[in-house]
């Protein structure tokens, strides 16, 4: 890879995310990174509610991270003395905030996966790991909380291999564990780092103690073998029995990490500031710069031509808006990642997703909750823009006047739970509308709907905690007092057999009439396949300009199914014939014909109700296992398997969301508070007939 002069600075850039299970110590790790990079003067403890990254009030109270804050920090490599810019995206570890993780994965080049050494790989860590796989993000793993009771570095390494199916490459080994955790051994450089003060700022570097020599030599051999597997030059040396140099080993591990074939594993205790500087060195050593990840691609309007945007400040502008936030002082902030080109304040950009030209106001580089104004953001940088009115999550921003291209967007999951919300007073009514609209702009997995007939407002989201926090923000940020109903399940509707319909809309009432006529074939698709519309009209029986309106009519009718009024999903609609009238046909008439046709097809197609099914994992002491399984079975659960972890059992099951309300309380009483569980949305499945009938009676 040849690097031009204008790209040189990018070799010293790292855009990383810190991703983990709730409570694995992710925010604390981020905090410590900011402390050691000189960005924070005093340390905030998450469990005391004062962390720098967790800056929304609810996050401080709950000690969990909700919104991914983007922060710019600087690090001087301990060994080489070279300076690096590290942009950190702090991602939430709670499953209800998966969209935040998805968004950050889109804009990262690498990630640090943080694990709790006493717990190994937990369910949410698995979800985050899979998301990183999907977006092709290279990772290093950090076995945190090595000072905690029950901490085991080997547990984390084995879990990465067994539960995640990845190849761990431990580049460190802990000296001691739990209360005796006193340092780490760097296997690459064969040095022991002993922590000599509480802040972890003083480190004594020396030789590997004799009692660890056998273990560390064996691990170094395994590390060289793993690196040789991904680097041919090293493989030749290895086969000839030669020892690689330190530089060769680092280069090979770097190559394997960037290719996502191996995952370096480090250890430490962020809370006690142990191992964080070495983690920063590893971020620099093994995670890619913006030049080492595949260039982002943009698709042109024809849907086929693809343009690559290499990371170069002198190239054409290509940026992705990955988060919208309402800021009390400056208004709407649009967080962007610049992939190519340079964004300057005061310039105009073209929002290709919305087909709008927008003016860039001021540009900010963000620290956890302070900011620095800049005149430009260059390729590889992350920052926030003030002044963009229309940009939303996942929108593509390109140069004003450039050809319209769309960068690959962000997968937005559909909400699975909804509840009714109403303002307490007349004065709250208007504020509630504004507040909900702003919150929905920030969070695309949060949907707001108003029933046309009853005027009832419902909000939908990814889980109970998600909606609880949004209602809480409505109260704090928009001063709206609201009553909320009990949570309801977001059902869907579909058809179970293929049908054909002939739908004609004709109206004659003096003067020009209305005429639209379409023949539709509607067929069921696999669960989760979404919606496909196909035009199979031949010979112009329906002119091209009426196909779009007919499709629009179909899509509008899909918003409300015949059984419970929930959206219709997983169908393919083919328009294969129809007719038109030279004078009376209009876009409106075809839209109505399309809409009527779909409604008729769903009625005829043996409609069914679909319900969200959650993947549930319960960790319980052995003696309560029977009760836990019995309870899950009584909730229409399907047990997927069990696995022993220490002296506890992990029960995995698929359970319909409608059966999981109030589960936390029931489970606590059945296990005397000793079990814990996590649940994530997994898939939609058909509701059994007897239950579907009950739902329709309600």
Swiss-Prot record:
Pfam families linked to this entry: EFG_C, EFG_III, EFG_IV, GTP_EFTU, GTP_EFTU_D2
GO cellular component term, pick one: cytoplasm
Protein's UniProt keywords contain Protein biosynthesis: yes
PROSITE patterns: G_TR_1, G_TR_2
Domain tr-type G per the UniProt entry, residue ranges: 11-291
One function term, GO molecular function aspect: translation elongation factor activity
Keywords tagged on the record: Cytoplasm, Elongation factor, GTP-binding, Nucleotide-binding, Protein biosynthesis
Binding site for GTP: 20-27, 90-94, 144-147
Principal localisation: cytoplasm
Domain of life: Bacteria
Compartments where located: Cytoplasm
Protein's GO biological process: ribosome disassembly
Family affiliation: Belongs to the TRAFAC class translation factor GTPase superfamily. Classic translation factor GTPase family. EF-G/EF-2 subfamily.
Functional description taken from the UniProt entry: Catalyzes the GTP-dependent ribosomal translocation step during translation elongation. During this step, the ribosome changes from the pre-translocational (PRE) to the post-translocational (POST) state as the newly formed A-site-bound peptidyl-tRNA and P-site-bound deacylated tRNA move to the P and E sites, respectively. Catalyzes the coordinated movement of the two tRNA molecules, the mRNA and conformational changes in the ribosome.
Record-linked PANTHER family: RIBOSOME-RELEASING FACTOR 2, MITOCHONDRIAL (PTHR43261:SF1), TRANSLATION ELONGATION FACTOR G-RELATED (PTHR43261)
Record's protein name: Elongation factor G
Naturally occurring in which organism (per UniProt): Deinococcus radiodurans (strain ATCC 13939 / DSM 20539 / JCM 16871 / CCUG 27074 / LMG 4051 / NBRC 15346 / NCIMB 9279 / VKM B-1422 / R1)
